């Protein structure tokens, strides 16, 4: 995102935009419940509550940002169609959101994308284009389609409406747990972390927001230390959902302002938390979500 667009986004009425996002999402995204975790509470000596977005529509929080973005578009824009690039949760979030809005969606995916993910995306009515060997090539093709055919590109994280959509998680936390003191969130591209931090700090700034990253994905640690986006040369982690080399420009600006602390976790801790959630809570949690749980140890 260009710097002028970042500055413009930072000047918007965050409280009003977050409330608007919540209103748009009513009837589409689930208000996921808060679940107490006795085992984590005993381990840490603090009351630990979980917000399982893996139980969200399409299986992840991504529907929130995707739908808020698409709901913000005019009918004329919708008529041109929606396009994005993703090999994971964002693809299904955009496909579902576009279907709800009555828009045609085209999702560009790498040719190596597992058939299960391709089929899951198609099931929501999207056209899937398999292009390129890696995600960057798919993303470049999606951008080309947007330019040539006038389609609207829905970014996975570097977009204000997407961020506000993810921020509705923070609003729900404040509503359901009015005495909350700390919120831990995993950082990948930064849309989720930026949205939650924006919501929490806008409405209850005394609450601490803590980011969590795998030790093999250092972009956020390096960027926050440098005071600017500092892409990682290599990313090695099982948590593919947060395995991002280049954090988003707008997410960085928001997280740099609002994040209280950053915790790095090991692959062993991530894997242990995946098993713990399955054994104690009967929740199937992907590695990216387990990153925030690992930060509690």
Residues of each region from the PLM?
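PLP-dependent amino-acid enzyme catalytic core
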Residues: 1-297
């Amino acid at each position: 995102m260009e710097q002028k667009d970042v500055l413009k986004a930072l000047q918007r009425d965050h409280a009003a935009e977050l409330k608007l996002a919540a209103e748009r999402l009513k009837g589409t995204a689930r208000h996921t419940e808060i679940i107490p975790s006795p085992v984590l509470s005993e381990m840490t000596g603090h009351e630990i509550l979980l917000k399982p977005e893996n139980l969200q529509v399409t299986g992840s929080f991504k529907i929130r940002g995707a739908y808020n973005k698409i709901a913000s578009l005019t009918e004329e824009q919708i008529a041109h169609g929606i396009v994005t690039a993703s090999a994971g949760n964002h693809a299904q979030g955009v496909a579902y959101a576009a279907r709800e809005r009555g828009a045609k969606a085209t999702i560009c995916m790498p040719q190596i994308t597992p058939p299960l993910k391709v089929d899951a995306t198609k099931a929501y009515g999207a056209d899937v284009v398999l292009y390129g060997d890696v995600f960057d090539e798919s993303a470049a093709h999606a951008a080309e389609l947007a330019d040539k055919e006038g389609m609207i590109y829905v970014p996975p994280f570097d977009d204000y409406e997407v961020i506000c959509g993810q921020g509705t998680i923070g609003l729900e936390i404040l509503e359901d747990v009015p005495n909350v003191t700390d919120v831990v969130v995993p950082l990948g591209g930064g849309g989720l972390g930026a949205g939650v931090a924006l919501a929490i700090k806008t409405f209850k700034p005394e609450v601490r927001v803590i980011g969590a990253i795998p030790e093999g994905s250092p972009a956020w640690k390096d960027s926050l230390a440098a005071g600017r986006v500092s892409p990682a040369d290599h990313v090695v982690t099982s948590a593919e959902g947060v395995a991002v080399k280049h954090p988003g420009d707008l997410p960085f600006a928001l997280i740099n302002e609002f994040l209280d602390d950053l915790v790095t976790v090991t692959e062993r801790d991530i894997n242990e938390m995946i098993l713990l959630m399955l054994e104690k809570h009967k929740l199937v949690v992907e590695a990216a979500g387990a990153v925030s749980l690992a930060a509690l140890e």
